[in-house]
């Protein structure tokens, strides 16, 4: 099984139309390469709120994803599953609820949970088994998924969320 991570400079809810267009092009290129390689997941970070309220950013992201699907269809790309990833900075779109909303709104979308990012956004709240089970319950209650793609590492965080990833040995 192959899982791919798309470029980090994707922003589905940018205030700049040119950045949205570039983001679409990056996702299309990722989907094309993923189809060639038989990737089962195409992981990406949804983007930054860009000083918008999260609800408005979500609305723009959904419109951008609709554009993405139109362009993928026009390109003849049919074999893909995008996997938006939870993000670590509080200025980024991508808390657990937002990832669930994106995935529940579109076919071919399944979540990626980066536990370090969730921990950083929550300013260090993943400390025991029950904390992790809470996330699993949210996913199970809202999405019909058979396979969950996750990342796990240690992370440095501050008031704004993620500062820096560290290796497990650090």
Positions of the model-derived regions?
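Acidic/histidine-rich catalytic cores of soluble enzymes
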Residues: 67-167
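N-terminal small/glycine-rich loop or linker at the start of catalytic domains
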Residues: 3-14, 159-165
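Active-site acidic/histidine proton-transfer and metal-coordination neighborhood
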Residues: 12-112
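Short beta-strand segments at enzyme active-site cores
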Residues: 2-6, 39-46, 152
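Conserved radical SAM core fold
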Residues: 8-11, 48-51, 118-120, 157-159
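Terminal, non-globular segments
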Residues: 1-2, 9, 16-21, 116-118
């Amino acid at each position: 099984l192959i899982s791919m991570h798309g470029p980090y400079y994707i922003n589905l809810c940018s205030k700049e139309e040119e950045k949205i267009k570039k983001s679409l092009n990056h996702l299309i290129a990722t989907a094309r390469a993923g189809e060639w390689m038989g990737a089962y997941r195409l992981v990406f970070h949804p983007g930054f709120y860009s000083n918008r309220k999260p609800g408005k950013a979500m609305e723009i992201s959904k419109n951008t994803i609709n554009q993405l699907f139109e362009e993928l269809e026009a390109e003849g790309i049919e074999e893909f599953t995008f996997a938006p990833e939870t993000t670590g900075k509080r200025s980024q779109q991508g808390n657990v609820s937002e990832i669930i909303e994106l995935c529940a709104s579109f076919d071919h979308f399944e979540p990626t949970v980066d536990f370090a990012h969730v921990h950083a956004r929550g300013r260090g709240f993943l400390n025991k088994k029950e904390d992790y089970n809470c996330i699993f319950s949210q996913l199970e209650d809202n999405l019909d998924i058979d396979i969950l793609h996750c990342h796990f590492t240690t992370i440095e965080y501050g008031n704004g969320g993620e500062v820096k990833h560290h290796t497990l040995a650090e």
